Structure formats: structure tokens, C-alpha cells
A protein has these predicted regions:
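Short, small-residue-biased leader/transition segments that mark boundaries at the very start
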Residues: 1-13
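Flexible, active-site-adjacent loop/turn segments at secondary-structure boundaries
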Residues: 3, 16-18, 132
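Pocket-edge positions in alpha/beta enzyme catalytic cores
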Residues: 4-5, 20, 62, 137
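Pocket-edge structural micro-motifs
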Residues: 7, 30, 49, 123-125
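Short, surface-exposed acidic-centric catalytic microdomains
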Residues: 17-66
């Protein structure tokens, strides 16, 4: 199967040199319904950051990626991933960049109405453990969104 996903996010390359090799990644793989080996070694997943440089932390989360990075680098990187079937837009910066006029409200509303963005995009909240409060306030995410995401991922990779 030559399908791949693009996970668009604003995180910088971590010290380990491997994206999603942390608790956020554990949660993301759980949401996707795949194990670590499938995620890293199947050739089915691609990660394209919103910036290669981590801009630092702000009062309510990470600072935004540098302006112009995605415009300059994403078209070149996406040429290397010609068989993308689904793009996961993780967090507000990826969603704002890719959804343009499709943006309706905040991350929570985009995630709640994820079906409006299919089949091309699937907006997600960042899977950080820091989002425990968000998860508790939005039980519909685990009850409705995660099962739909898992079913879609399984359909694509099998």
C-alpha cells in the first residue's frame, strides 16, 4: 500500500531527532489505532512540521511558527509524498494555514466538525498530556472523533 499521511504540526524536531517519540506520540498513535512499528516503519506515515525551528513557549502554549516557512518548504516536501490520502492538521497553526477560508472558529469547533474537512483534512487537537483539561471538557472527542479517525486510518492502510 502506497498511502501515506501528512501530520502537519508546529513542533520543532525534538532532541531525540524523532517526531512523536514521546507521550504525545503515544497518545497520537492510540488515536490513530496503530502501533509504534506501523507508525515509524511502514512507510504509511509522513510528518511535515509547520517549522523546523522551535519558536519557544508563550503564556498559553507554544509560540507560532515563523512566517513564510510553510509557504517556502511545504510545496517541496509535499512533492516527496505524492500518495497522501489524508492530512492530519494537528493544532491551531496547521489548521489556520491549511484551512484558510474553511476555518470556522477555534480548534475545538474544527475538531468537533471534522467531517466538514474530509476527505482531504482531519483537524485534531494536539495530543499533548497538557491537554488533559481539554479532553475532560470534551468527552465527545474520545467517544466520537477517535473511533471515526481509527476507522478511517484502518480503511486507508489496509
Amino acid at each position: 500500500n502506497t498511502a501515506s499521511y501528512t501530520l502537519s504540526l508546529h513542533d520543532a524536531l525534538p532532541i531525540s531527532g524523532i517526531y512523536w517519540k514521546d507521550k504525545s506520540g503515544d497518545r497520537l498513535r492510540e488515536w490513530l489505532g496503530v502501533d509504534e512499528d506501523t507508525f515509524y516503519n511502514s512507510g504509511l506515515f509522513a510528518v511535515i512540521p509547520m517549522d523546523f525551528y522551535f519558536p519557544g513557549h508563550g503564556k498559553s502554549g507554544d509560540l507560532p511558527p515563523r512566517k513564510g516557512f510553510a509557504e517556502k518548504w511545504h510545496p517541496q516536501l509535499l512533492k516527496e509524498c505524492p500518495d497522501i490520502e489524508l492530512t492530519l492538521l494537528i493544532g491551531q497553526y496547521a489548521q489556520a494555514y491549511y484551512l484558510h477560508e474553511k476555518v470556522s472558529g477555534k480548534v475545538t469547533e474544527r475538531v468537533r466538525h471534522f467531517k466538514n474537512y474530509l476527505p482531504e483534512y482531519f483537524p485534531l487537537v494536539h495530543p499533548s498530556p497538557r491537554n488533559q483539561i481539554w479532553m475532560a471538557k470534551n468527552p465527545w472527542f474520545a467517544e466520537q472523533v477517535v473511533p471515526d479517525l481509527q476507522a478511517l486510518v484502518q480503511k486507508i492502510i489496509h
